Regions:
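C-terminal and inter-domain tail/linker signature
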Residues: 17-192
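C-terminal motif of bacterial Sec signal peptides marking the signal peptidase cleavage site
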Residues: 12-15
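Positively charged n-region of N-terminal signal peptides that target proteins for export
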Residues: 1-4
């Protein structure tokens, strides 16, 4: 009889265990996925060299921190458009490859898309589960229109979204000078 009471008590305790909460609400997950789609619209516009499509996900009050160091100054809407037009004029076949590179996360499977991250469990600022700040990793591939040189840049972006789901804060990091080096190396190799 003691065994039956013990087994019954043990089953009762185990069945009352709280479900594990991974800290991600369905609302925040949906918001995160929508922001990924907005970023994909942005990169699709780049690929098609369609300024209207690219800018369709950009807020009028965008503050952009370009990959070239400029003393920490942010650039507004008109400067952002001007930079995009410069890319479209200078390059063709522009495409973004999400998360290209090794998957270094110990808990992730080899096929996981590690391009997009949001929220912060550990932070020097206040930890948050709010997905309004998106971190994106990948590679931009391109072909230089004038020389025909093909190249690519590893890229990291910090993107903030407003309540309408548009990008209002954008900092991107890449070896901007490396683009010129790749073009120059192509020109040198084609002269030999």
């Amino acid at each position: 009889m003691k065994r039956i009471v013990f087994i019954f008590s043990l089953m009762l305790i185990i069945s009352c265990e709280s479900p594990v909460n991974n800290g991600v609400s369905q609302e925040n997950q949906a918001k995160f996925e929508q922001q990924i789609e907005s970023f994909r619209t942005f990169t699709d516009g780049f690929n098609k060299e369609d300024l209207e499509l690219t800018m369709s996900v950009i807020a009028d009050d965008i503050q952009w921190s370009p990959p070239v160091y400029n003393g920490g100054e942010t650039i507004g809407y008109d400067g952002f458009v001007e930079a995009l037009e410069g890319y479209f004029e200078t390059f063709e076949d522009i495409q973004f490859i999400e998360g290209e590179g090794p998957n270094l996360g110990p808990a992730l499977n080899a096929d996981a898309n590690t391009a997009f991250w949001s929220g912060s469990l550990y932070s020097s600022a206040t930890p948050t589960d709010d997905p309004s700040g998106l971190r994106v990793y990948g590679v931009w591939k391109w072909k230089h229109s004038e020389s025909g040189a093909e190249g690519g840049n590893k890229w990291y972006g910090l993107i903030n979204f407003n309540e309408e789901g548009k990008i209002y804060g954008f900092s991107d990091y890449m070896d901007y000078h490396g683009m010129q080096v790749q073009i120059e190396n192509y020109l040198k190799s084609s002269q030999n």
